[in-house]
């Protein structure tokens, strides 16, 4: 998906700050063709899913804001889409979409791989390869836990759904036989 999708998605998506966070990850993931659980993994690592998180202690003088810890180095480009620091902090869906936009840019520029995920935190600097790999490994570990949790939940729900279908089939069969 093209990076230019951000303004269109944000214009058509009028979700308030009170929107269900899962919906924001799901929709941003769908629009940017990124697994929502990967986006959530980044937010867990970056801020423990804290919408108003602010980290102003970067060595290079930049700050990271919102649940996705979007770096202030992106503010110039985001201004073109009417996305400000305040919007990132006050609208969790804008924050998630912006994080997805950053990650999608990395995937488009450097390939869809764990190194690009690591660049979400470090950028492409060759001086930060070790830090990038460590960050990517942390995200991978969180992502694996979320995937395992999703699988476990679906396995637990599947038998219940199967029983409901058996009951419906039995009810339909008895209705059709005139009983």
State where each predicted segment sits.
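N-terminal signal peptide c-region/cleavage motif recognized by signal peptidases
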Residues: 12-16
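Intrinsic disorder/low-complexity segments, especially N-terminal tails and targeting/processing regions
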Residues: 5, 17, 169-171
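Low-complexity, Gly/Ser/Thr/Pro-rich intrinsically disordered linker/tail segments
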Residues: 161-179
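Catalytic glycan-binding domains that act on GlcNAc-containing polysaccharides
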Residues: 18-162
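Sec-dependent signal peptide recognition
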Residues: 1-9
């Amino acid at each position: 998906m093209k990076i230019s999708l951000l303004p269109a998605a944000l214009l058509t998506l009028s979700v308030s700050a009170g929107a269900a966070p899962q919906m924001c990850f799901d929709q941003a993931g769908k629009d940017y063709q990124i697994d929502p659980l990967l986006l959530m993994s980044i937010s867990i690592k970056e801020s423990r899913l804290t919408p108003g998180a602010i980290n102003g202690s970067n060595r290079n003088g930049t700050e990271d804001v919102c649940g996705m810890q979007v770096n202030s180095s992106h503010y110039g480009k985001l201004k073109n889409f009417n996305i400000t620091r305040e919007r990132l902090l006050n609208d969790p869906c804008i924050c998630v979409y912006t994080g997805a936009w950053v990650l999608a840019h990395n995937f488009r520029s450097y390939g869809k791989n764990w190194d690009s995920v690591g660049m979400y935190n470090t950028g492409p600097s060759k001086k930060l390869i070790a830090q990038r790999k460590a960050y990517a490994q942390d995200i991978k570990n969180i992502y694996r836990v979320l995937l395992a949790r999703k699988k476990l939940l679906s396995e637990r729900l599947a038998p219940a759904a199967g029983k409901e279908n058996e009951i419906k089939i039995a009810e339909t069969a008895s209705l059709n036989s005139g009983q």
